[in-house]
A protein has these predicted regions:
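Amphipathic alpha-helical binding modules
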Residues: 78-125
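Residue-level signature of the C-terminal ends
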Residues: 24, 59-63, 115-118
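HEAT/armadillo-like alpha-solenoid scaffolds in large eukaryotic assembly and transport factors
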Residues: 64-76
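Helix-start/N-cap signature of alpha-helical segments
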Residues: 7, 42-50, 100
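Short terminal alpha-helical segments
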Residues: 1-42
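Amphipathic alpha-helical elements of HEAT/ARM-like alpha-solenoid repeat scaffolds that form extended
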Residues: 2, 10-13, 46-61, 92-93, ...
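Charged, low-complexity interaction regions
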Residues: 37-45, 65-67, 92-96
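Short amphipathic alpha-helical heptad-repeat segments
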Residues: 21-29, 75-87
């Protein structure tokens, strides 16, 4: 295929690069989710980086560029169950304000759900 347009992502090399980037984001999330649950608590690095990676994947997928890959929707749903169980079990220990806790929960759930929806849409196209 080579090059199919003038855009920054309209060639095979860019598609390969995007695939490498999305694979890295997915691998980081998968590794964090398979690891020690303490590492994904809300005040830990992966507790912050996991939802950030998921949002980055959503942003990339919405662009429709060749090369962006997403995990299966069922995998995302399992990650959501695991992550939210850890989050719910540890957030109160950080003594957040009730408003922040509710808002953050909404954002986290939306982050997982939007990515799963994007994957399902990709599968149906």
């Amino acid at each position: 295929m080579g090059t199919w347009g003038a855009g920054n992502f309209e060639n095979d090399t860019a598609a390969d690069h995007l695939s490498i980037l999305t694979d890295r984001l997915i691998t980081e999330v998968a590794d964090a989710m398979a690891g020690d649950p303490v590492e994904i608590e809300p005040d830990e690095y992966w507790g912050v980086a996991v939802p950030a990676n998921l949002e980055l994947l959503s942003l990339l997928a919405r662009q429709g560029h060749v090369g962006a890959s997403l995990p299966e929707a069922e995998v995302i749903e399992e990650w959501k169950r695991t992550y939210m169980a850890v989050w719910e079990g540890s957030i109160d220990g950080l003594m957040p304000s009730p408003g922040h806790k509710d808002e953050r929960r909404t954002v986290l759930i939306r982050t997982f759900d939007e990515l799963a929806t994007l994957r399902r849409k990709e599968d149906s196209d």
